[in-house]
């Protein structure tokens, strides 16, 4: 695959995931450093690329993939075999691999966002966080 590779987005942990994997794999790419909540994701150009208007987005030629975990898994599967980063092919081993991917997204990332939303100033963006029971 020799198509031009673009990574859209910067300044968030989610964009860092994709950027980190590109570096781990030694893959060349160009950066489009748009940020969230700046209006840059709302442009007609970016909306055509990613209708959800979120970052990051990976573009390889006509192929576009969004969601950081999907991007990381795609890159690992497509380019990671030589570096030992490709997901396992055995169904149960892959299930364990997926377990840790989903754990990091839901348990670590979601809880961090809740704490920040509850105790910092993200409530202005996302609304008040509900009280934990």
Language-model-detected regions and their locations in the chain:
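GST-like domain detector, emphasizing the conserved glutathione-binding G-site
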Residues: 1-130
């Amino acid at each position: 695959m020799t198509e031009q590779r673009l990574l859209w987005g910067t300044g968030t942990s989610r964009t860092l995931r994709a950027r980190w994997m590109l570096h781990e794999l030694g893959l060349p790419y160009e950066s489009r450093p748009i940020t969230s909540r700046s209006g840059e994701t709302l442009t007609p150009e970016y909306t055509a690329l990613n209708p959800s208007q979120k970052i990051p987005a990976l573009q390889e030629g006509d192929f576009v993939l969004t969601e950081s975990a999907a991007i990381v898994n795609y890159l690992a599967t497509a380019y990671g075999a030589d570096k030992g980063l490709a997901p396992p092919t055995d169904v149960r081993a892959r299930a364990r691999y997926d377990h840790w991917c989903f754990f990091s997204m839901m348990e670590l990332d979601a809880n961090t966002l809740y704490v920040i939303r509850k105790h910092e100033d993200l409530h202005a963006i996302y609304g008040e966080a509900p009280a934990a029971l």
